[in-house]
């Protein structure tokens, strides 16, 4: 069965994870969730943009070591992050540099502005999201060969989760969405994450 990457990744963002992250950032829970969702979509479209670079997917995923702190804190079978500490602040930064190079700072600021969270929070949840996405792909290495096609197939849905300013930085039109704008705006953040947000 072909996985929906966003749905699979959102499974890991439980209320417990949000609560632990907010010990560092003191943001509104709903805005923090939205920021993570935007960041995950941004990382996925960053990968989409690298599809034509030979071996890029294999190389960036190989940067995730199985003995790394963040990787070991994920129970992939259960779809749970077991513990949240600040290791991602350092571990995720190198991934973002590979993915976005000189656009990294602009994307971080745009996440902050578009979502309504502090600049520091935006920087660090981008690190967190980069590690989550790459760790998921590291665990599911069989997806690497078909990742380009997966991202192409899911491109419009992913773009729906990304605000216009970030789309422009990534090189996409603001109108590259699959839903009518009013329908998309009316979607509840909590619905995006399903029941898992309320599970511990």
Predicted region positions:
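A structural "flexibility-hinge" signal
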Residues: 1-200
């Amino acid at each position: 069965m072909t996985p929906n990457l966003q749905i699979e990744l959102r499974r890991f963002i439980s209320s417990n994870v949000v609560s632990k992250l907010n010990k560092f950032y003191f943001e509104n829970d709903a805005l923090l969730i939205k920021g993570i969702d935007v960041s995950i979509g941004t990382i996925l479209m960053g990968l989409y943009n690298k599809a034509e670079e030979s071996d890029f997917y294999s190389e960036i995923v190989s940067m995730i070591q199985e003995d790394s702190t963040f990787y070991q804190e994920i129970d992939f079978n259960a779809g749970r992050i077991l513990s949240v500490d600040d290791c991602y602040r350092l571990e995720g930064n190198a991934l973002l540099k590979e993915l976005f190079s000189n656009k990294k700072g602009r994307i971080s600021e745009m996440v902050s502005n578009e979502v309504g969270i502090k600049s520091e929070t935006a920087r660090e949840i981008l690190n967190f999201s980069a590690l989550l996405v790459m760790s998921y792909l590291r665990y599911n290495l069989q997806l690497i060969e078909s990742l380009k096609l997966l991202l192409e197939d899911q491109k419009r849905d992913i773009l729906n989760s990304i605000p216009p300013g970030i789309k422009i930085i990534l090189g996409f039109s603001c109108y590259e969405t699959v839903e009518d704008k009013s329908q998309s705006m009316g979607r509840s953040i909590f619905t995006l994450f399903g029941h898992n947000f309320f599970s511990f």
